[in-house]
Regions:
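Serine/threonine-rich, repeat-prone extracellular segments and beta-strand-based repeat modules
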Residues: 5-19, 721-762
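N-terminal catalytic cores of secreted or lumenal carbohydrate-active enzymes
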Residues: 35-250, 254, 366-421
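Noncatalytic carbohydrate-binding groove/subsite architecture in carbohydrate-active enzymes
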Residues: 173, 246, 367-502, 506, ...
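Extended beta-strand solenoid/passenger and fiber regions
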Residues: 237-349, 354-366
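Aromatic/acidic polysaccharide-binding cleft in carbohydrate-active enzymes
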Residues: 474, 478-593
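Carbohydrate-binding surface patches
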Residues: 587-628, 634-638, 674-680
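C-terminal low-complexity, Ser/Thr- and acidic/Pro-rich disordered "stalk" regions positioned immediately N-terminal
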Residues: 768-827
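C-terminal membrane-anchoring or membrane-association module
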Residues: 837-857
């Protein structure tokens, strides 16, 4: 029994020790949350310049009538969707999209709707996938971009196009009518005839989408390599340099639907099928002024074509003829159009008709252009346009061309080819991967850790590897692939804010979230989960998520509001800034980040992301100037981490606006847990006269041989800039000789940030020593420090749901009071730390002593 009692007592003591340790850690954490973290920035030090009007954008997809956002009857984007888009203020819009852009044929999406052709999905051979209506074409996206003031980022289809086609595109987008730099068809006039006389002035071009994801055995279902996987030397070399692609018994396709099931013979006369990766015909002017195919163009290599008809298990080769008119009714012959890649069969009178349900197979070779040739075509055509226009205002068209082949091998290959001048950067899609966790909190923490490992570090590595001057281009990012409802919640909004700040620092010219719109559902399609869209489309009665036709209800997710806050919260000049400390989550992910910038109107702009799920943070703003009296417009979004909006409750998660007038030169602001906060610190009111700095310096007397520092005891303060540091350069005159008795003078000069200069001269008397001895110093008559009164205790905050009530983004926190810009800790801070530290140490010490004594006895 004695042993049992002893054992039980030891367990009790260990339990008490653990509890004391937990209490100590809680106290330390509470203390740390109340101690201000200094955010330092120098408004005179610009780290990089951004286009704040366009940097935060979104990836949009033309398919399925823009996922329900486009009305094919009016041929315009729907008004209610446009209103939401404008509300967010997306700065740039990526078109025709990601994977879905890889086989986009732009020339067949312009002009009258009846003359357009259906487009081919990037994953065209998945079950149920068919041709895509070409309603939302180049003209339609350009009209929309003009209306909403967004910059177009164009993804060029390397899977379908070539250098000539790319050059024609640049003319269509950016040339003035009549310049026609490449001759042939005046594509600028075609644009004008289609209703847009002025150029679109597109300056960003991505060549393909994620074309490093090239899997040879999954063309049409999962691979984005297309013809590059059929080139000797591998897809990376093919993408970069082009080459001859060789195909053996590849099924031939319908012109407007490449799905295998849709490409079988219909058993009708005049069947025509196509070689998938033939070069697109560049077109020419016909005799009647119409645009027609160029019959001299070589779409596939002559003599390389063989054709079979049958099925995968059994098929028969058909003979190639130059003219079907010479064939008999039962002759199994086919005519090849080498200018388009078409395979034409007979009508039952001249040449046999492949039986209904049979597949057509074709072997062929084709010479394809790679990235380098296409980039040259884009940049050279841009130069030709500039030469032809002969502008006198100093402005010029620019064409920034980015590779979509995300690999270190591409970087090395371009350097070895001496071709670095032909790419301006690399598109990187740093998706998170799927977060894991049994609870919303665990999922959240893992997502924020993945934000660093996959979302940011991957980009940093490519920045390190690329040559100087090349930029990372973040045209898709986010939490992917995950169908959790949390992807539509506050959690994803904070993920976006966290990584976006780093992408700004890393130099991305535009940062585009994937994706603009998708169906509101609990699932996914071949392009990914629908939850990742920042605007959700809810189908109403009769609406189709297959075609995107019909009525949809639209609402903004918290992610959309995060992008709104980021876009409104950044200025063109990003400042170098640092945090005095970087708190972390339990898994090591950084939980606090900030970005400071300024705009052309003199506003200082601050974006703060606090990922901690339980603790607010207080930041002291040290911006090298006096902020007292300046007004800050504040926006905060701090909903619960699983909070989301719905069509019925669209305002469940929205930013909250407030304002604060700073009462200190270096004020403090407090941000709530799991929050995104922006501050727009306005300049002083118009009419405020810049005050000159004030120098405080007194005449001094020293004794021969004393050390002399002309800045000792000298201070300078400016009403706008605050305390001004002094250095040797501020001593503009100094004739003091500390070894020779006499009267001397020192002049101190300072200049504030707005150019106001002040000088002050003081006298220094050097006196001889008396009797060769140095007098004893006088005793200091000043009294000792006053004891600090014990602050009154304040109640400890409740759990996470009550944090917002206790901490406000107004420069103060409940339980705190401002004193010249300095924060006094409440009883929940330093006092609690001291009390609990003593209690914990006594408990731990008592437990150890008791255990030691028991062991001795």
């Amino acid at each position: 029994n004695a042993m049992d009692n002893t054992s039980g007592s030891a367990v009790a003591r260990m339990t008490a020790m653990n509890a004391a340790g937990t209490a100590l850690q809680t106290a330390i954490t509470a203390y740390q949350a109340h101690v201000p973290i200094t955010l330092t920035a120098d408004p005179s030090t610009v780290e990089r310049t951004v286009d704040s009007a366009s940097i935060f954008g979104v990836n949009h997809r033309y398919a399925f009538n823009g996922y329900g956002s486009f009305d094919p009857d009016t041929m315009r984007v729907k008004d209610d969707f446009t209103a939401l888009y404008k509300q967010v203020g997306f700065g740039s819009i990526r078109y025709p999209g990601g994977t879905i852009s890889n086989l986009f044929n732009w020339k067949t999406t312009i002009g009258p709707r009846a003359q357009r052709l259906k487009q081919i999905h990037g994953f065209y051979n998945n079950p149920g996938q068919g041709g895509i209506e070409p309603n939302f074409g180049i003209g339609e996206i350009a009209t929309f971009a003009d209306e909403v003031n967004s910059e177009i980022v164009y993804v060029y289809s390397l899977g379908r196009g070539n250098a000539q086609d790319a050059a024609d595109l640049i003319e269509y987008l950016n040339a003035q009518v009549g310049t026609n730099p490449n001759g042939g068809i005046d594509w600028a006039k075609v644009r004008a005839d289609n209703g847009h006389p002025q150029p679109y002035n597109v300056r960003y071009f991505e060549i393909g989408n994620e074309m490093n994801q090239a899997w040879a055995n999954s063309d049409g279902t999962a691979s984005q390599g297309y013809w590059t996987t059929a080139v000797s030397g591998g897809s990376e070399q093919a993408y970069t340099e082009g080459g001859t692609a060789s195909f053996t018994k590849q099924y031939a396709v319908s012109l407007e639907d490449w799905n295998k099931a849709a490409s079988v013979s219909d058993g009708k006369a005049g069947l025509t099928r196509y070689m998938r990766y033939a070069n697109v015909n560049p077109k020419m002017n016909g005799d009647d002024g119409a645009i027609v195919d160029d019959p001299s163009f070589v779409a596939v290599n002559k003599g390389s074509v063989s054709v079979w008809v049958g099925n995968d298990q059994s098929n028969e080769q058909w003979r190639i003829v130059d003219d079907l008119e010479t064939a008999g009714a039962g002759d199994k012959v086919v005519q090849v159009d080498y200018s388009t890649g078409a395979l034409r069969f007979g009508d039952g009178v001249h040449g046999a008709i492949p039986a209904k349900g049979q597949q057509v197979y074709v072997s062929y070779t084709v010479d394809r252009d790679g990235f380098v040739k296409i980039s040259k075509a884009i940049k050279n055509t841009t130069d030709q346009i500039n030469t032809a226009e002969q502008r006198t205002d100093g402005t010029r068209h620019t064409a920034n061309v980015y590779t979509s082949y995300e690999s270190t091998g591409f970087i090395t290959r371009m350097a070895n080819l001496n071709a670095n001048q032909w790419y301006d950067g690399m598109t990187i899609h740093p998706y998170s991967g799927t977060p894991t966790g049994a609870t919303a909190g665990a999922w959240y923490d893992d997502a924020m850790k993945k934000a660093e490992t996959a979302g940011v570090n991957r980009v940093k590595e490519y920045v390190r590897l690329m040559p100087a001057g090349k930029v990372p281009v973040i045209s898709e990012y986010g939490i992917f692939r995950d169908t959790s409802a949390l992807v539509r919640s506050q959690s994803h909004a904070l993920y976006i804010a966290k990584v976006a700040l780093e992408y700004v620092r890393l130099g991305s010219p535009y940062i585009q979230k994937h994706c603009l719109i998708d169906w509101y559902s609990s699932g996914a399609d071949s392009l990914g989960p629908t939850q990742q869209a920042v605007i959700q489309a809810v189908p109403e009665d009769g609406a189709s998520t297959v075609t995107g036709e019909g009525r949809f209800g639209f609402f903004l997710t918290p992610s959309a509001y995060a992008l709104q806050m980021l876009g409104n919260g950044i200025g063109d000049s990003v400042l170098t800034s640092t945090l005095g400390s970087t708190p972390t989550l339990g898994n090591g992910a950084t939980s606090l980040s900030a970005l400071v910038s300024k705009d052309d109107d003199g506003n200082l702009r601050v974006i703060i992301v606090n990922l901690d799920r339980a603790l607010g943070r207080t930041l002291k703003l040290n911006f090298g100037q006096d902020l007292s009296g300046r007004v800050a417009d504040v926006q905060t979004m701090d909903a619960a981490i699983n909070a989301e909006n719905t069509l019925e409750n669209q305002d469940n998660v929205t930013p909250v606006d407030s304002s604060v007038t700073f009462d200190a030169a270096t004020p403090t602001v407090t941000v709530t847990p799991h929050s995104l906060t922006t501050l727009k610190i306005r300049p002083r009111a118009a009419g405020t006269i810049n005050a000159a700095p004030v120098i405080t310096a007194s005449d001094r007397t020293i004794t021969v041989g004393d050390a002399f520092d002309p800045l000792d005891g000298v201070t300078a303060h400016d009403a706008e800039d605050g305390d001004m540091p002094l250095a040797a350069a501020n001593v503009t005159a100094d004739d003091v000789d500390p070894d020779t008795p006499g009267t001397y003078h020192v002049t101190i000069t300072v200049t504030d940030s707005q150019g106001a200069t002040t000088s002050k001269t003081f006298t220094v008397v050097v006196q001889a020593k008396e009797g060769g001895e140095t007098p004893e110093p006088e005793p200091d008559p000043s009294p000792g420090p006053e004891p600090t009164p014990e602050p009154a205790p304040s109640p400890a905050p409740d759990e996470e749901t009550d944090q917002a009530a206790h901490q406000k983004p107004d420069g103060k926190t409940n339980g705190q009071q401002a004193d010249n810009g300095k924060t006094k800790l409440s009883h929940t801070g330093a006092s609690v730390l001291v009390a609990l530290t003593c209690t914990a140490m006594l408990a731990i010490g008592g437990g150890l002593i008791a255990t030691f004594r028991r062991k001795r006895s």
